[in-house]
Every structure is written in C-alpha cells, then in structure tokens.
Amino acid sequence: YTDGLALKALKTIFEYLPRAYENGASDPVAREKMADASTIAGMAFANAFLGVCHSMAHKLGAFFNLPHGVANALMINETIKFNAAEAPVKMGTFPQYDHPHTLERYAEIADYLGIKGRNNKEKLDNLIRAIDELKANVGIKRTIRDYGIDENEFIERLDEMAEQAFDDQCTGANPRYPLISEIKDMYLRAYYGE
C-alpha cells in the first residue's frame, strides 16, 4: 500500500519545492506542504524500502561531504535509466517478479504528474527532463564534478565507493540488482554528466 503515498509525495514535491526554495520562511504553506511530502514519502519507503540511488548517495555523501539530498539528486537520473532497462543483467531480489516493470512504473509516475509522451520510453525521457528542470529550479548543479570534487580524487576513490554502495542495505531492494561495475558506470556518468 505504498504507491498512493509515493505518488502523492512526488506530486507535492513537484508543486511546492520550487516555492519553498524560492520563498523560504515567507511561504509557510509551501514549507508545510514539503514537510507533509517528506513525511508521506517516509511512510512509503518505510514499507517499500529504498534502492540503489540511496546506496550510491550514502557513499557519495560520506566520501565527498555532500548533503544527502544533493547526493540523491545527482544520482537519480542515472538510477532511473538503469532501472528502466528492458533487459537487465541481473534481476532484483524479490522473486515474485519475473521481470522488472520499472519502465512501465516510471511511465505511470509521468502520467500522474501530467507529463506526456506517446509511449513509455518517451514518458520516461520527459520525466527525466522534468526532474532536471526541478533540480535546476532549486539550485542543484548538473554533475558531481560541478560541486568541486577533483576528478583524480573521484577516480581514485571510485572502486571503494562503488563496492560500499553495492554492500549498502538499500541495494538489495532495488528492482534491478546492480553489478559493482554498473554502479561505477552510474557514478562516472553522474560525475561527467554523460
């Protein structure tokens, strides 16, 4: 019973986060709505768990002192693309699913948010664009590198960071189970913006 909670939280975030960011304390309604969205999202993930985005964000924040929300925002697009793949190398750990339904689920999210597309792939692409727009509207930079993280240091720590993200408690609940090499690839794409 988590879908409705997650969808409500998403819609509220898309509607009120830019206002809360822009207006701060002068817009108590937007701040209240964001507190509600945070609580509702917490209720959803307390039952449905998190996934590899949070795993990677935990390590990105720990290794490079980035706030957890920023780290999640930096990793979300790559995670969505990874999860939406039609033919994963390895499935998630929940055996009741014979294949991932994530592309379809992301399209449902797009529909709920009023994001259009002629098919599920187009809805996915438009959802990612909407997320990029939301991030830009609240001051989230485009890449990990944009936060001043030195390329050599990032590459030097990448293997350890990817291994720790793989072992993070959230990874097992991801709908598509990542290989360590796939986690590294997601980090690299998020670093360079590719």
Which residue stretches match the model-derived regions?
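Short, amphipathic C-terminal "tail helix"
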Residues: E153-E194
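Carboxylate- and glycine-rich phosphate/diphosphate-binding segment that chelates Mg2+/Mn2+
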Residues: Y1-A48
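Predominant activation on well-ordered alpha-helical scaffold segments within soluble catalytic domains
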Residues: L7-P18, A35-T39, C53, A57-G61, ...
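Glycine-rich phosphate/pyrophosphate-binding beta-alpha loops
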Residues: T39-N72, D167-A173
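Hydrophobic packing residues in well-ordered alpha-helices of helical domains and bundles
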Residues: A6, R31-M34, L124, L158, ...
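Gly/Pro-rich interdomain helix-loop hinge
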Residues: L66, V70-E153
